[in-house]
Swiss-Prot record:
This protein's name: ORM1-like protein 3
Membrane topology (Extracellular): 118-121
Organism: Mus musculus (Mouse)
Region (Important for ceramide level-sensing): 1-17
Knockout or disruption consequences: No overt phenotype, although knockout mice show elevated brain levels of sphingolipids, including dihydrosphingosine, dihydroceramide, ceramide and sphingosine, compared with wild-type animals. Double knockdown of ORMDL1 and ORMDL3 show elevated brain levels of sphingolipids, compared with single knockout and wild-type animals. At 8 weeks of age, both male and female ORMDL1/3 double knockout mice weigh significantly less than wild-type mice and exhibit impaired myelination and motor-function abnormalities. The triple knockout ORMDL1, ORMDL2 and ORMDL3 is not viable.
Length: 153
């Protein structure tokens, strides 16, 4: 028995999406965002769907693909300091259930948004660019890659 040690992960960022109820909470948060946007007067339903998609994808991009490091003191000699949250998730193992969920969620939201905006050209272009912005960094080939040196340090 190790006295004075906790039974937690070395880096809590690696397992946060595997916590109980986190997927349901995530979907409910997206639904809540959509309902709040729907309650704004004089905003049409297609605009609300596009705003829901854009806000979700912007938040996902910022929190998963630009913020690096961990808010915890980790004994990994600073390895997590240079990794984004997406790269830390599940210890960098690709194609886990959490990664699949976070990859499929913006795609489903994109399909819903495209349907409810009736494939309007402006909405379609905005939503497609937004989707590509969050899907491309999730590709396994881009694990640890910094395009043009952006977010290198």
């Amino acid at each position: 028995m190790n006295v004075g040690t906790a039974h937690s992960e070395v880096n809590p960022n690696t397992r946060v999406m595997n916590s109980r109820g986190i997927w349901l909470s995530y979907v409910l948060a997206i639904g809540l965002l959509h309902v709040v946007l729907l309650s704004i007067p004089f905003v049409s339903v297609p605009v609300v769907w596009t705003l829901t998609n854009l806000i979700h994808n912007l938040g996902m991009y910022i929190f998963l693909h630009t913020v690096k490091g961990t808010p915890f003191e980790t004994p990994d000699q600073g390895k997590a300091r240079l990794l984004t949250h997406w790269e830390q998730m599940d210890y960098g193992v690709q194609f886990t259930a959490s990664r699949k969920f976070l990859t499929i969620t913006p795609i489903v939201l994109y399909f819903l948004t495209s349907f409810y905006t009736k494939y309007d050209q402006v909405h379609f272009i905005l939503n497609t660019v937004s989707l590509m912005t969050v899907l491309i960094p999730k590709l396994p080939q881009l694990h640890g890659v910094r395009i043009f040196g952006i977010n290198k340090y």
